[in-house]
Amino acid sequence: MSDFYQDFNKRRTFAIISHPDAGKTTVTEKLLLFGGAIQLAGTVKGRKADRHATSDWMEMEKERGISITTSVMQFIHNQHVINLLDTPGHEDFSEDTYRTLTAVDSALMVIDVAKGVEERTVKLMEVCRLRDTPIMTFINKLDREGREPIDLLDEVESVLGIQCAPITWPVGMGKRFKGIYHRYQDIIYLYQQGSNAKKVEAMQIKGLDNPQLDELIGDSADELREEIELVKGASHEFNLEAYLAGKMTPVYFGSAINNFGIKELLDDFVEYAPGPQPRATQERVVSPHEETFSGFVFKIQANMDPKHRDRIAFVRVCSGSYKKGMKLNHLRIGKEVQISNALTFMAGDRSHTELALAGDIIGLHNHGTIRIGDTFTQGEHLKFTGIPNFAPELFRLVRLRDPLKSKALLKGLIELSEEGATQVFRPLNSNQLILGAVGILQFDVVAHRLKHEYKVDCIYESVNIACARWVYSEDDKAMSEFRTKAYDYLALDGGDMLMYLAPTKVNLTMAEERYPKIKFCATREH
């Protein structure tokens, strides 16, 4: 095993954030291609094409051509181990995506040159902001006509509130796209349309004043020189400290579908992006340098492999190392468990791992005992913080076509809700089952998976619920009185936590005023 593989400082764990259709899945594919993890990139162009994108492996994703679950992919580049967490780009998938961002040390933002900063990117950026996550930016699709690069940088600065430092700069775009200029290497990489699935080394010209540049790209050479002068005066110079503090984003341009501009981005990413960072727990801050193992569960995925009806808990390693067969404490249930078969991932291809260090993601087989937010250590009592659970915003009543399947329905709904994208509620005053989600597409996903994975056919009906809140009180008497008086509005979630299901926003406001000793919470820590 190579030396760098055993050095946690050589780990880079990141996620890609973007608006749907900015080309995130293609960028993911091409990073894997340049990282040597896949020999042939499955283009995402033909949605029904035979070769599906490596990172979209769940059946429904393949049918629809969108990334629904957070895949984890590990590859090696320039003697660094890179863990890429693929977040769903579809506008629906907030919860899973938010939680994924708690498990990374940096992020890559992908922006469509024609569309600029879009609403979904703004939301994801807000989450990164909460933790000052360092962000690199890739402006994609330069092989098409788009907006002026300088205008895009202005938009990123004003809308997202982060300084931009262009590292590479495009030479034209669309039909006039000639290449990119790396401002810090003083090298022009000439554009040639990459055969989609293969790596192509771009032709390089050293120096902006090189006469060879004029020979090869004609008038575009003088235009580039003028633009670079303007950029020097109008934009920020790259500052590593500002980037690591989440205050500045280095910006790269390219065309992922043509494999262009990706290698320059990847080389710099490995050099500048942070390794594993310290993590906060309720008790203290855990440093990645510590020798004893600690980690937290940020995602649970049911039935990753239909051949083995299984559930996998994804654990971010925060300190120490995982070694095959080691014993770990599962703190929430107070049990010591032996972990002999943790998994590492290459999007759906699983292999048993002998070693995982801080920054790595491992998969633990879960037979219903592990939940999102659980902490594993080698004995110390710690609880990692900052892993959110959001109250759903959309609700449906779940009905069975076959009443004899009610046990299988409850099992399916609870197991799927453990993945964290949906939540199931059981009202105290009835036997009904209510499904809550943050995005509308989740209802389709659940119905599809209930049918295919649990053999349960369900239908949805509308239900009179506008919003849901977890309810707590430190005053037992007040809580007991509240339970009695608000009984018809109360339900238990999948983890048996009490929730208030309000038929209208006004009803919720009145309840908050009427019961001042009860806390109504829209989010809770796992």
Swiss-Prot record:
Positions of the tr-type G domain: 9-277
For this UniProt entry, what's an example GO CC term?
A: cytosol
Kindly list the positions annotated as binding GTP. 18-25, 86-90, 140-143
Which Pfam families does the record associate with it?
Answer: EF-G_D2, GTP_EFTU, RF3_C
Which GO terms are recorded in the biological process aspect for this UniProt protein?
regulation of translational termination
InterPro entries, alphabetized? EF-G-like_DII, EFG_III/V, G_TR_CS, P-loop_NTPase, PrfC, RF3_C, RF3_dom_3_sf, RF3_GTP-bd
Highest taxon listed in the record's lineage: Bacteria
Keywords annotated in UniProt: Cytoplasm, GTP-binding, Nucleotide-binding, Protein biosynthesis
GO MF, one annotated term: guanosine tetraphosphate binding
List where in the cell it is found: Cytoplasm
**Cross-referenced NCBIfam families, in alphabetical order?**
prfC (TIGR00503), PRK00741.1 (NF001964), small_GTP (TIGR00231)
Functionally, this protein is described as follows: Increases the formation of ribosomal termination complexes and stimulates activities of RF-1 and RF-2. It binds guanine nucleotides and has strong preference for UGA stop codons. It may interact directly with the ribosome. The stimulation of RF-1 and RF-2 is significantly reduced by GTP and GDP, but not by GMP.
Please state which protein family the record places this protein in: Belongs to the TRAFAC class translation factor GTPase superfamily. Classic translation factor GTPase family. PrfC subfamily.
Q: From the Swiss-Prot or TrEMBL record, give the protein name.
A: Peptide chain release factor 3
Q: Which gene encodes it?
A: prfC
